[in-house]
């Protein structure tokens, strides 16, 4: 059994066991293999920051600023480490963490998704697509769920824009957060090894007149059927198996999510 190392454009590399290894690109690799495992952490996406004139290092090296392009500098963190909040004032103003993430085409969702969160994420997706419709976007998820309508709005935007949107989960991707994780570009959906994924049928509350309650129940049933069909398309699993999994809260480890087809690979950490 030979080991195949792949270095994708997003800075991920993983190994796959196959009898006839063939080099392949990350973006064109859409077939899932439950044996795949990421063997290196996400590399820094800030490769062009030196060209912009602003660079930093998490070890505490002094920051260098080029006054010729002060407003477009980005942070260059040590490879394998996440962006670090810079304590620096630049000629273009204070540089905050959200700006660093946005300039490097990274979207972070770390809370339940409601209408306000969906508006922010959709605005970021559309803006990044209008700036550059050829470069990929990376979405980090530590999300316990949220509004079905809001999550479907984000997914529709992810599917509509031209850039490919990869997803990476850590912590928890539950309920509609799991739907977003699975709805990322096929071949670009990942999770940390300690991530917990939970899928289930949509939850709703009903109230009002009897006729109003009946209509709300019908809407919830329709939402469940739609989401089950989406999971079946995302995972390649039969619809009957998806319905069995979503009948009640189904908790999955990262490895089980990989086997089920919700993700395409695992990011490897020390433990």
Curated annotation (Swiss-Prot):
Biased composition (Polar residues): 13-30
Keywords, ordered alphabetically: Chloroplast, Hydrolase, Plastid, Protease, Serine protease, Transit peptide
Domain of life: Eukaryota
Record-linked CDD domains: S14_ClpP_2 (cd07017)
Subcellular location: Plastid, Chloroplast stroma
EC number: 3.4.21.92
Catalysed conversion reaction: Hydrolysis of proteins to small peptides in the presence of ATP and magnesium. alpha-casein is the usual test substrate. In the absence of ATP, only oligopeptides shorter than five residues are hydrolyzed (such as succinyl-Leu-Tyr-|-NHMec, and Leu-Tyr-Leu-|-Tyr-Trp, in which cleavage of the -Tyr-|-Leu- and -Tyr-|-Trp bonds also occurs)
Transit peptide: 1-77
Induction: Repressed in darkness. Induced during cold acclimation (at protein level).
Main location: plastid
Renumbered residue ranges of the record's region Disordered: 1-30
GO biological process entries: proteolysis
Tissue: Mostly expressed in leaves. Also detected in stems, and to a lower extent, in roots (at protein level).
Active site: 175 (nucleophile), 200
Protein function: Cleaves peptides in various proteins in a process that requires ATP hydrolysis. Has a chymotrypsin-like activity. Plays a major role in the degradation of misfolded proteins. Essential protein required for chloroplast development and integrity.
Binding partners and assembly: Component of the chloroplastic Clp protease core complex which consist of at least 16 proteins: CLPP4 (3 copies), CLPP5 (3 copies), CLPR4 (2 copies), ClpP1 (1 copy), CLPP6 (1 copy), CLPR2 (1 copy), CLPT1 (1 copy), CLPT2 (1 copy) and 3 copies of CLPP3 and/or CLPR1 and/or CLPR3. The core complex is organized in two heptameric rings, one containing CLPP3,4,5,6 in a 1:2:3:1 ratio and the other CLPP1 and CLPR1,2,3,4 in a 3:1:1:1:1 ratio.
Family: Belongs to the peptidase S14 family.
UniProt name for this protein: ATP-dependent Clp protease proteolytic subunit 6, chloroplastic
Gene: CLPP6
């Amino acid at each position: 059994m030979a080991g195949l190392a792949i270095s994708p454009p997003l800075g991920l590399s993983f190994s796959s066991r196959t009898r006839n290894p063939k080099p392949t690109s990350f973006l064109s690799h859409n077939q899932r293999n439950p044996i795949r495992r990421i063997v290196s952490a996400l590399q820094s996406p800030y490769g062009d920051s030196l060209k912009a004139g602003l660079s930093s290092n998490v070890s505490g090296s002094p920051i260098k600023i080029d006054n010729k392009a002060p407003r477009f500098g980005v942070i260059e963190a040590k490879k394998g480490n996440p962006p670090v909040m810079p304590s620096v004032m630049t000629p273009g103003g204070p540089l905050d963490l959200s700006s660093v993430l946005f300039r490097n085409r990274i979207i972070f969702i770390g809370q339940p998704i409601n209408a306000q969160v969906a508006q922010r994420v959709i605005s970021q997706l559309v803006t990044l697509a209008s700036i550059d419709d050829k470069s990929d976007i990376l979405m980090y998820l530590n999300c316990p769920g949220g509004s079905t309508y809001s999550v479907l709005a984000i997914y529709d935007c992810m599917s509509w824009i031209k850039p490919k949107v990869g997803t990476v989960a850590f912590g928890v991707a539950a309920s509609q957060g799991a739907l977003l994780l699975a709805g990322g570009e096929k071949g670009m959906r990942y999770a940390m090894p300690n991530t917990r994924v939970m899928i289930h049928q949509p939850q709703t509350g009903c109230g009002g007149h009897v006729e109003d309650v009946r209509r709300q129940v019908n809407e919830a049933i329709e939402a469940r059927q739609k989401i089950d069909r989406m999971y079946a398309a995302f995972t390649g699993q039969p619809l009957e198996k998806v319905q069995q999994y979503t009948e009640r809260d189904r908790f999955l480890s990262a490895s089980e999510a990989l086997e089920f087809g919700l993700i395409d690979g695992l990011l490897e950490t020390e433990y």
